């Protein structure tokens, strides 16, 4: 995928709590991307209508999901972006239902053999993907299953894995006091936007 002069970085917010820790860190990451000269956009999944995958396999044939909801527009935004940064809290040792429904719907990009649909491959090849996780547990590795899911997706599909920022914050907004976490998120955004 040829890089534009101004990179486009898409932020995907997977928490239902706008203004919460995941949202604050995603804003930091997008500020870092913007500081590096990128055009940025944020999508809040909880404000979108996204149904779960029905495993009907129609997208394996056409590359287009038959479910007519907001994910169709998000697919277009993913294709247009040079990098995607996801931010999600840990809910019951995994990602939120909003993020899971979104990630499952990525199957529209693939054929039945889990290879890129040929018309998507040129637009997805080398696309950068990063992750921010926030958990209430002091042990940030509580988020390991989420990191594994996103990193494995990147490896399987030959996306460029930017890495994960893993943090801990128990109450809404607590992360604002964590200068290290904010800097790590900012730096992830800069990395996403640097050619």
Describe the residue ranges of each PLM region.
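Short, Lys/Arg-enriched N-terminal segments with co-localized hydrophobic residues
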Residues: 1-6
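N-terminal beta1-alpha1 ligand-phosphate binding loop
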Residues: 7-38
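Glycine-rich phosphate/pyrophosphate-binding loop and the adjoining helix
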Residues: 7, 35-36, 141, 147-195
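Residue-level recognition of beta-strand->loop/alpha-helix junctions
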Residues: 13, 44, 165-166
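Short, hinge-like loop/turn segments at secondary-structure boundaries
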Residues: 57-61, 104, 180-182
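A short beta-strand-loop structural module common to alpha/beta enzyme folds
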Residues: 38-48
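Helix-loop-strand module that forms the ligand-binding subsite of alpha/beta enzymes
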Residues: 66-155
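Cysteine-cluster motifs in flexible loop/terminal segments that predominantly coordinate metals
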Residues: 49-75
């Amino acid at each position: 995928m040829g890089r534009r002069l101004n990179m486009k970085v898409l932020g995907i917010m997977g928490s239902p709590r706008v203004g919460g820790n995941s949202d604050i860190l995603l804003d930091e990451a997008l500020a870092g991307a913007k500081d590096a000269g990128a055009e940025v956009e944020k999508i809040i999944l909880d404000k979108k209508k996204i149904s779960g995958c029905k495993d009907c396999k129609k997208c394996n044939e056409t590359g287009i999901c038959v479910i007519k909801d907001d994910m169709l527009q998000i697919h277009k935004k993913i294709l247009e972006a040079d990098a995607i940064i996801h931010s999600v809290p840990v809910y019951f040792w995994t990602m939120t239902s909003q993020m899971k429904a979104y990630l499952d719907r990525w199957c529209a990009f693939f054929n039945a053999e889990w290879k890129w649909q040929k018309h998507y491959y040129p637009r997805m090849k080398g696309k950068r993907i990063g992750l921010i996780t926030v958990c209430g547990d002091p042990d940030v590795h509580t988020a390991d299953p989420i990191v594994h899911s996103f990193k494995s997706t990147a490896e399987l599909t030959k996306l460029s894995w930017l890495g994960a920022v893993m943090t801990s914050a128990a109450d809404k907004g607590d992360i604002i006091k964590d200068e290290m976490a904010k800097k790590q998120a900012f730096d992830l955004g800069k990395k996403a936007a640097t050619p």
